[in-house]
Amino acid sequence: MRVLLVGASGFIGRSIATKAPEHFELTGTYHRNKPNLERIELEQFNFLDASVDWSLIVKKYDCIIIAARANGNTESSRNEVSRQANNAFTRFIEAVRESQSKPFIVTVNGSLSYGECGEKLVQVDDQINPTGYARSYAIAEQPLRDFLTDGQEVAIIRAPWVIGAGSWFPMMYLHSNRIPIIGNGMQWMSLVSVDELAEYVWKTVESSKSGVLHPQLTYRCRQKEFADIVHEVTSKKTQRIGIVR
């Protein structure tokens, strides 16, 4: 199977590339920083480039995994880049619709798309109500959601907090002097390791399972419990901070 991984240089993309089964013919893309990855072909590619002819890309692959994310330092800049991504993915979907070969599409996004759910367990058929960074990412994802709503072959994987080397965890919990307890610390934290998420992506590719999908969790706990675990390991003191919206 010929697979294209858009965003092989990112935190999640690198792990997906590393965990690729040997029987897949994998091509990974990067924008600026070429990753050091073995066994895969690497191509420089800016998916936001309006001149990209997606039809030439689509016809070469049996599956396309989108692990790239439109980033920005502020909400306005993220929204602007996400609008560009929306345009790019709209053209991508149009190329898929017009192609004789219909590659299976897998896109990796976050469970923050569901917003604040309190004690409620999120289900795959729940409506999105994005908060924080996810408000921007939802703009980019919209053409893929619409494609799925039309009954087409696409898997939207909504991952919770992804933990691993290069994730948010060292910055928030290891590099700071104190371990934060956010608000009353009773918010649920659902965690998945980046390696287990990558393995789930490949299982999805092999099964060609469409729909909104939730990977199996590595761990689930209250945020205060997570902070206490880090405290036990690092001996750093905890500190309560306000909730950032």
Predicted regions and their residues:
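Catalytic helix-loop patch of NAD(P)-dependent Rossmann-fold dehydrogenases
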Residues: 116-156, 161
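Conserved Rossmann-fold NAD(P)-dependent oxidoreductase catalytic core, especially the SDR/UDP-sugar
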Residues: 90-132
